[in-house]
């Protein structure tokens, strides 16, 4: 998420270096110094390397020598430069006498684009060297971020070019250029496309220089986007085809554009416009009185951050708005601040506190438990999360609390400590925090909370407080016992379940409560381990070559192998334009044990023998006797870096030629298998991830048949020359493709896991096929919609949030479990959720869960309120279970016990532990629970937890005194502004609604409230904060480490005021008549209409291997009555410079003071699923109008390099008579209901279907007219229900993806 601490936090500002000093620093850093790098991996010892700054690309690089760069980081990603040894990398060597560097000789660079930052921990040779690096990098951080967009583009272009031209020869091949453009999201159809645009290539080599590359980029960006409806482009010579550098936009024309189209009042000053143009261009040849833009430069300006839709003047803190009581502000708040991942097994980290505080968070949480040596530790109690020292946390808070903001920090203490350790806590609070700790009221006579200005640079303690005159006493908590709270579990931890298909054991998180055993989906057993483990080495270094794409094994007998190698190299190099040095390695046909290196040079294939010999019983490999290698892999790696030398030439091995037919020997490949046969095989393996690959009848075409979400699906793979295509993702071979999707999801969360053939079926196949895996029956020659099988009840899991549009529909959140689902035709199903029975919901919002009655009897007990929340896989009723230890173990696991249920015949669950002690403890506790379950549950529900508070700690609590929420006190004299209440989201939802929202807002005008995620969110997901905010809750605590929409909304809310962590709530919310859920209660606010056209985008990020097909979702989020979404069409295969057809989107907003405009860029993948690419979210009150850039961010709200949308935006006031200008008489909400612009679902009306055929699934052609007739005949079973909806995946069985539009 966007780090808000500017580089000045590290020392720039009044003490910034002079121009001469900057020049000296930059030269010194460019030359570089030798420093010792401390690794994050335990297996790597510290090493001395040369570190340099590449000013052309603004990167820090390191290497052992001058030849090869081993690593680099972008300076734009640096968040903090920290002097000293404060990093985990240094901590690992505290006890190692060989590595005890002087504190003053060390510094740490923290960088990254996620919440959890990476570290570069360095030891310099002197303190002066450290100061040089810190001072120089601090200046470079600020200068890099503030650089004008054309200069940023120049640096980006050089970074891309040098990533290929590693030897700095100022030339790359056409093949390299094609691959590079693919990496930046631009599809090059063929090599001829490049040759036509690079007419001045060197005749002999065909290489491309940097200048040619930069000119090609400029041409590609402009030519693709010159069709956009923009000022200047309509009338200039561009339309006649004249090159953009021959068309100029003068200073006067640009000034007129800023005034007329952009509404920039500062542009009335001609001198300011001139200065702006000069600073943007930074072109010495145009530092003249009348600067000008070329047309392509003007378009670049429109996409630039300098033309942002956000009013940057709102980024500054306004002290005049910081004089209200704290209860009038939204305050940026974190939940379980110490965690870096999930809530049950991730690492607790000091860096999480530093990161949150530097992001402007002003309320952080300390979860304190008794620790060793009389001092508390902080972690998520009764879980596997790691522990950190309370005292270390306080020192971290002191160091980082006021870097990003000077406004007060609230420490929310979750206290589980004994009296003795509470006293030590209080002592450390005073000792470490000193004068920053608030220990007495600002104003004793006040009748409300103090203001942020009154509390500047103060730290407040939120903790329970004793009554007057008590030394210590028991105080009741407001939290009642809940079996669903993981902190009340009897035991929890990682146990292992055996996969019935491959018999591997996989970790799952188990929770034992007073009556049930809950266990999660497959998880990681080492999430708390920050260390990056080395990849597993091959069983023998001599076998490393066997998995390399350049190794082809034995190609043929005698001279056949030589001929085959020559054919493969010739075809590959001619077709792809591969450079000299392209190569493959094969087994020698003539010399047993030797190999042959075949390579491409000057349009011919040449061969070279690789000799082998035994040396002391180990093989050695060499081309010449004077340079011998331990393995074939080492030999090839060497000659990829160092040239082969002979009398005639010198040449490095460049590009490996991939194997083309290696798939034929793989267990998953079937050369002659029909679709029906493939489905029948997969029906006998009821496991997601089962797959096979089959040859299709069409030339150069294959299909992957697989199981996902309990259903069989297919996708087509196409061989195009030397490239294998899946959708728009390119691979070198089928083997490469399957290997990739064994590690990465192919469809939603499903990875290829179980290769299926006849031998596998004999071992793991069921006797009876699972016909439920097929969506529909088959009609020979034509796929039909009708399902001849009877419908059955099942459970489904929500993929997205859905809000009911009618009274007979369900409302649910993402990951909700909907029970007793009855599938209906027309895209709408019925089900039970949230106490509502058999209501409608769109089927494309959910994924079907495995039928619990078929595979896992314990799934019948699924509980949506389990302590595992969305991670839940199964539930067992402990009294109904029988436990038995298996002394002999099972399948390489020694410590195994079985859980069986007599009520379910022939069913048992084998569970493995890591040790005998762990096994015995689990079995003992489960048996105890089985005997006393009812008594334990009754005791827990009857018990009101009470807590003893130490006087020394109570005295530190001044304003934030947690007390049980009492609705009866609201608005009475008994309400005390110093008291506050905390609510889990589930309890808060009872007050942030139409019935009680106004009353809760009244409470929040005087007192603080803190909302936090429910305990079942073990995956650290977040709830929707908007209802809490509009009802006045100040401390809406979120998991900052989670990159989801709620956190992105949180970052948007606090972007005004420079991310200082305090935003004054609108004055409307302090109006006694205001009701958060009734727009008629709005007084003094003028409703508005926002009209937006999405014109184009630049530099969208990639998602996986393919070129993206992007579309843009536009959303207004805010008050319930204002929230709506619309979307554009998708653009095929272009993420570098896509253009959308002109289409206006209109949004009516009644409460613009509490409204956000949100853009999300998705790609549509081959399954018609949408995958997140980028987003940008802004408060509506800070938007500019005109032709504006929308700078895009990643899911952590970090700026994406050069990524932006270009939109045209207008904001109109509503007319007093209720009509909306300029569209009087017609509701814009109705206008916006055009089905092609609605997100996720469409209610299809009779006769309104128009099918769109998706090529990746075209196994058979069908009649569109027949299908349209078929759709028309489908109706919802009740006349008053929604008529139908469009499925994102309408027909997975038959590879048909249809979309319906009104």
From Swiss-Prot:
PH domain ranges (all copies): 27-142, 489-523, 895-931
Regulation of its activity: Activated by phosphorylation on tyrosine residues.
Gene Ontology CC terms: cell-cell junction; cytoplasm; cytosol; glutamatergic synapse; lamellipodium; plasma membrane; ruffle; Schaffer collateral - CA1 synapse
Active site (catalytic residues): 335, 380
Protein name: 1-phosphatidylinositol 4,5-bisphosphate phosphodiesterase gamma-1
PTM: Tyrosine phosphorylated in response to signaling via activated FLT3, KIT and PDGFRA. Tyrosine phosphorylated by activated FGFR1, FGFR2, FGFR3 and FGFR4. Tyrosine phosphorylated by activated FLT1 and KDR. Tyrosine phosphorylated by activated PDGFRB. The receptor-mediated activation of PLCG1 involves its phosphorylation by tyrosine kinases in response to ligation of a variety of growth factor receptors and immune system receptors. For instance, SYK phosphorylates and activates PLCG1 in response to ligation of the B-cell receptor. Ubiquitinated by CBLB in activated T-cells.
PANTHER family from the UniProt entry: 1-PHOSPHATIDYLINOSITOL 4,5-BISPHOSPHATE PHOSPHODIESTERASE GAMMA-1, PHOSPHOINOSITIDE-SPECIFIC PHOSPHOLIPASE C FAMILY PROTEIN
Domain EF-hand intervals: 152-187
Domain spans labelled SH2: 550-657, 668-756
Chain positions found as N-acetylalanine: 2
Requisite cofactors: Ca(2+)
EC class (word): hydrolase
EC number assigned by the record: 3.1.4.11
Domain PI-PLC X-box residues, every copy: 320-464
Entry function: Mediates the production of the second messenger molecules diacylglycerol (DAG) and inositol 1,4,5-trisphosphate (IP3). Plays an important role in the regulation of intracellular signaling cascades. Becomes activated in response to ligand-mediated activation of receptor-type tyrosine kinases, such as PDGFRA, PDGFRB, EGFR, FGFR1, FGFR2, FGFR3 and FGFR4. Plays a role in actin reorganization and cell migration.
Keyword field contains Acetylation: yes
Catalytic reactions of this protein: a 1,2-diacyl-sn-glycero-3-phospho-(1D-myo-inositol-4,5-bisphosphate) + H2O = 1D-myo-inositol 1,4,5-trisphosphate + a 1,2-diacyl-sn-glycerol + H(+); a 1,2-diacyl-sn-glycero-3-phospho-(1D-myo-inositol) + H2O = 1D-myo-inositol 1-phosphate + a 1,2-diacyl-sn-glycerol + H(+)
Domain named PI-PLC Y-box: residues: 953-1070
Assembly behavior: Interacts (via SH2 domain) with FGFR1, FGFR2, FGFR3 and FGFR4 (phosphorylated). Interacts with RALGPS1. Interacts (via SH2 domains) with VIL1 (phosphorylated at C-terminus tyrosine phosphorylation sites). Interacts (via SH2 domain) with RET. Interacts with AGAP2 via its SH3 domain. Interacts with LAT (phosphorylated) upon TCR activation. Interacts (via SH3 domain) with the Pro-rich domain of TNK1. Associates with BLNK, VAV1, GRB2 and NCK1 in a B-cell antigen receptor-dependent fashion. Interacts with CBLB in activated T-cells; which inhibits phosphorylation. Interacts with SHB.
Listed SMART domains: C2 (SM00239), PH (SM00233), PLCXc (SM00148), PLCYc (SM00149), SH2 (SM00252), SH3 (SM00326)
């Amino acid at each position: 998420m966007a780090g808000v601490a500017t580089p000045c936090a590290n020392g720039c500002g009044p003490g910034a270096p002079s121009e001469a000093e900057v020049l000296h620093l930059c030269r010194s850093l460019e030359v570089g110094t030798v420093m010792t790098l401390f690794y994050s991996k335990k297996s790597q010892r510290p090493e001395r390397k040369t570190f340099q700054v590449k000013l052309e690309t603004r990167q820090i690089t390191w290497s052992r020598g001058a030849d090869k760069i081993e690593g680099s980081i972008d300076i734009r990603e640096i968040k903090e430069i920290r002097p000293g040894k404060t990093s985990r990398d240094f901590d690992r060597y505290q006890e190692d006498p060989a590595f005890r560097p002087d504190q003053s000789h060390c510094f740490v660079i923290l960088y990254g684009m996620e919440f959890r930052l990476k570290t570069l921990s360095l030891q310099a040779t002197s303190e002066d060297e450290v100061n040089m690096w810190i001072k120089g990098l601090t200046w470079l951080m600020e200068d890099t971020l503030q650089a004008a967009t054309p200069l940023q583009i120049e640096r980006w272009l050089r970074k891309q070019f040098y990533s290929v031209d590693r030897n700095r020869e100022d030339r790359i091949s056409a093949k390299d250029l094609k691959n590079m453009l693919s990496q930046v999201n631009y599809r090059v159809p063929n090599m001829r496309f490049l040759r036509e645009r690079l007419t001045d290539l060197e005749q002999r080599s065909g290489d491309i220089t940097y200048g040619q590359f930069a000119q090609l980029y400029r041409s590609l960006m402009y030519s693709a986007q010159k069709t956009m409806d923009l000022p200047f482009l309509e009338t200039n010579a561009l339309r006649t085809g004249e090159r953009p550098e021959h068309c100029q936009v003068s200073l006067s024309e640009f000034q007129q554009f800023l005034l007329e189209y952009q509404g920039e009042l500062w542009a009335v000053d001609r001198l300011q416009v001139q200065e702006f143009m000069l600073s943007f261009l930074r072109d010495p040849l145009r530092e003249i009185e009348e600067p000008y833009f070329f047309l392509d430069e003007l378009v670049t300006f429109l996409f630039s951050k300098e033309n942002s839709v956000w009013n940057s003047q709102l980024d500054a803190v306004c002290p005049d708005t910081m004089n209200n009581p704290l209860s009038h502000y939204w305050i940026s708040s974190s939940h379980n601040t110490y965690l870096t991942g999930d809530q049950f097994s991730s690492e607790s980290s000091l860096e999480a506190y530093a990161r949150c505080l530097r992001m402007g968070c002003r309320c952080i949480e300390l979860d304190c438990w008794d620790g060793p040596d009389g001092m508390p530790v902080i972690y998520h109690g009764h879980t596997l999360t790691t522990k950190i020292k309370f005292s270390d946390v306080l020192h971290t808070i002191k160091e980082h609390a006021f870097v990003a903001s000077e406004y007060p920090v609230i420490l929310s203490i979750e206290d589980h400590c004994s009296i003795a350790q509470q006293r030590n806590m209080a002592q450390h609070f005073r000792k470490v925090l000193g004068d920053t700790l608030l220990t007495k009221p600002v104003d004793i006579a006040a009748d409300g909370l103090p203001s942020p200005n009154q509390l500047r640079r103060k730290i407040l303690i939120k903790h329970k407080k004793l009554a007057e005159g008590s030394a210590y006493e028991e105080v009741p908590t407001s939290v009642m016992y809940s079996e669903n709270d993981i902190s009340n579990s009897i035991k929890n931890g990682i146990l292992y379940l055996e996969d019935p298909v491959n018999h591997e054991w996989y970790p799952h998180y188990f929770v034992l409560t007073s009556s049930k055993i809950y266990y999660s989906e497959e998880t990681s057993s080492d999430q708390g381990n920050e260390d990056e483990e080395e990849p597993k080495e091959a069983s023998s270094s001599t076998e490393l070559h066997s998995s390399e794409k350049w190794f082809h094994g034995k190609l043929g007998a005698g001279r056949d192998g030589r001929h085959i190698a020559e054919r493969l190299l010739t075809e590959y190099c001619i077709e792809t334009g591969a450079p000299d040095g392209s190569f493959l390695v094969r087994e020698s046909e003539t010399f047993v044990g030797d190999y042959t290196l075949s390579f491409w040079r000057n349009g011919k294939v040449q061969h070279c023998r690789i000799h082998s010999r035994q040396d002391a019983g180990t093989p050695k490999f060499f081309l010449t006797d004077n340079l011998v290698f331990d393995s074939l892999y080492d030999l090839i790696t060497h000659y990829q870096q160092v040239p082969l030398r002979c009398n005639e030439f010198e040449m490095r091995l460049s590009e490996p030629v991939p194997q083309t037919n290696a798939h034929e020997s793989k267990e998953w490949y079937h050369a002659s298998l029909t679709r029906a046969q493939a489905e029948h095989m997969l029906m006998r393996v009821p496991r997601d991830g089962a797959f096979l690959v089959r040859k299709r009848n069409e030339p150069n075409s294959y299909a992957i048949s697989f199981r996902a979400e309990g259903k069989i699906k297919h996708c087509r793979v196409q061989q195009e020359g030397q490239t294998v295509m899946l959708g728009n993702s390119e691979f070198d071979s089928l083997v490469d493709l399957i290997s990739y999707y064994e590690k990465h999801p192919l469809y939603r969360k499903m990875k290829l896991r179980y290769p299926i053939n006849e031998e596998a079926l004999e071992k793991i196949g069921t006797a009876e096929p699972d016909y439920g895996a097929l969506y529909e029956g088959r009609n020979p020659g034509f796929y039909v919609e009708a399902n001849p099988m009877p419908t059955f009840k099942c459970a489904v899991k929500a993929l997205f949030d859905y809000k009911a549009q009618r009274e007979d529909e369900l409302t649910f959140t993402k990951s909700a479990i909907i029970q007793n689902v009855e599938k209906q035709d027309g895209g709408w199903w019925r089900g039970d959720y949230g106490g509502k029975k058999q209501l409608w919901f769109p089927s494309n919002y959910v994924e079907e869960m495995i039928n619990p009655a078929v595979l896992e009897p314990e799934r019948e007990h699924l509980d949506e309120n389990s302590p595992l929340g969305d991670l839940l896989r199964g539930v067992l009723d402990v009294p109904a279970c029988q436990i038995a230890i298996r002394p002999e173990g099972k399948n390489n696991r020694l410590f195994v016990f079985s859980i069986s249920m007599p009520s379910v015949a022939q069913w048992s669950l084998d569970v493995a532990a890591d040790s005998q002690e762990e096994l015995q403890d689990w079995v003992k506790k489960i048996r105890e629970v089985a005997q006393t379950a009812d008594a334990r549950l009754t005791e827990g529900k009857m018990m009101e937890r009470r807590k003893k508070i130490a006087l020394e700690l109570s005295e530190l609590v001044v304003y934030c005194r947690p007390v049980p929420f009492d609705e009866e006190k609201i608005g009475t004299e008994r309400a005390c502004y110093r008291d506050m209440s905390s609510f889990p989201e589930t309890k808060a939802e009872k007050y942030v609604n139409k019935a009680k929202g106004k009353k809760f807002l009244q409470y929040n005008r005087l007192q603080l409230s803190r909302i936090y995620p429910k305990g079942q969110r073990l995956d650290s997901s977040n709830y929707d904060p908007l209802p809490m905010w509009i009802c006045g809750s100040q401390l809406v605590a979120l998991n900052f480490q989670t990159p989801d929409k709620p956190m992105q909304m949180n970052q948007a809310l606090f972007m005004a005021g420079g991310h200082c962590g305090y935003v004054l709530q609108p004055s409307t919310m302090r109006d006694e008549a205001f009701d958060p859920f009734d727009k008629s209660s709005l007084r003094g606010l003028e409703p508005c209409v926002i009209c937006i056209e999405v014109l184009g985008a630049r530099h969208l990020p990639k998602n996986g291997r393919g070129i993206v097909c992007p579309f843009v979702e536009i959303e207004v989020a805010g008050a319930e009555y204002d929230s709506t979404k619309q979307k554009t069409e998708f653009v095929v295969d272009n993420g570098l410079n896509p253009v959308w057809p002109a289409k206006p989107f209109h949004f009516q907003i009644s409460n613009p003071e509490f409204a956000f405009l949100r853009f999300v860029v998705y790609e549509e993948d081959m399954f018609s699923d949408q995958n997140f690419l980028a987003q940008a979210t802004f408060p509506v009150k800070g938007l500019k109008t005109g032709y504006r850039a929308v700078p895009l961010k990643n899911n952590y709200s970090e700026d994406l390099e050069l990524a932006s949308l270009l939109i045209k935006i207008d904001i109109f006031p509503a007319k007093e008579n209720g009509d909306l200008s300029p569209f009087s008489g017609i509701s814009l909400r109705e206008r916006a209901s055009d089905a092609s612009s609605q997100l996720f679902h469409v209610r299809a009306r009779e006769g309104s279907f128009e099918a769109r055929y998706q090529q990746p699934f075209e196994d058979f052609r069908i009649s569109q007219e027949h299908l349209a007739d078929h759709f028309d005949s489908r109706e919802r079973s009740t006349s008053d229900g929604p008529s139908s909806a469009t499925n994102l995946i309408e027909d997975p069985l038959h590879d048909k993806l249809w979309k319906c539009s009104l």
